[in-house]
Regions:
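Accessory terminal helices/loops
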Residues: 155-165, 174-254
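Active-site metal-binding loops of divalent metal-dependent hydrolases
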Residues: 33-35, 58, 82-83, 115-116, ...
Length: 254
């Protein structure tokens, strides 16, 4: 059976969330549906049938729509093993494979603690759906994990192929770039990205997806060993963890 090309579209929710819709013009997957209403509307408009739900972590803005979706569609929900959920789900963790045959797509689960302790991401040959771990030009706040855990998680993502498309779940790119420029005011890649993102947002388009290559050149949380960042962070020790911890704190108050 020939598979239709996979299409990936953001469904905007709340103030700045993206619920990711993956479909082949017939069947669909949603990732982190914090709100059911826009998902149901999109499925109806596009004449799609929901076939699976993927969850990266337990925060309400990522799972709030699951119960309502399950009332309309009896589908599997894949969610982190190390977190609790108020709905039936298939618990998955590090190294497990989710085989979505109707999309000719396989996701490997990565356990990436930091934002929450059980946070997972879904990675394929071409795509990374990383919830609130890696943001476009930023990273998630440390609600449950330690700086060391988050840094280790981000360092794992740095090793993915450079052309991997990065799909996170918040439209934070503009402010993240502005913060990054306080640490690397001479980084031309950041200025170029700021201009590109400003135009996208002006046109009411998402700034996502990013790529691992783009993040490596513009995301300060993946660049803690850069001399400019070390200098502007004003740390007494220049090791990667100390720098990461400081700039995460600076971003919290930016």
């Amino acid at each position: 059976m020939q598979h239709q090309p996979l299409q990936i579209e953001p469904i905007p929710a709340f103030e700045d969330n993206y619920i990711w819709l993956l479909h082949n013009t017939r069947d669909a997957i949603v990732i982190d549906p914090g709100d059911a209403a826009p998902v149901l509307a999109s499925l109806k408009t596009k004449k799609l049938t929901l076939s699976a739900i993927l969850i990266t972590h337990h925060h309400a803005d990522h799972i709030g729509g699951v119960a309502s979706l399950l009332e309309s569609y009896s589908v599997p929900v894949y969610a982190p093993s190390y977190e609790q959920f108020p709905f039936n789900h298939i618990a998955v963790t590090e190294g497990e494979i989710i085989d979505l045959t109707q999309f000719d797509l396989k996701f490997q689960v990565m356990w990436l603690p930091g934002h929450t302790l059980g946070h997972i991401a879904f990675v394929s040959e071409a795509y990374l759906f990383c919830g609130d771990v890696l943001f476009s030009a930023g990273c998630g706040r440390l609600f449950e994990g330690t700086p060391a855990q988050m840094l280790a998680s981000l360092n794992r993502l740095k090793k993915l192929p450079a052309d991997t498309q990065v799909y996170c779940t918040h439209e934070y790119t503009g402010k993240n770039i502005d913060f990054a420029l306080t640490l690397e005011p001479e980084n031309q890649a950041l200025f170029d990205r700021k201009q590109a993102v400003s135009q996208l947002r002006k046109d009411n388009k998402p700034s996502l997806p990013s790529t691992i290559a783009l993040e490596l050149s513009t995301n300060p949380f993946l660049r803690c060993n850069q001399s400019s960042i070390i200098r502007h962070a004003e740390v007494t020790e220049a090791d990667e963890l100390t720098v990461f911890t400081k700039i995460r704190l600076l971003r919290n108050h930016y």
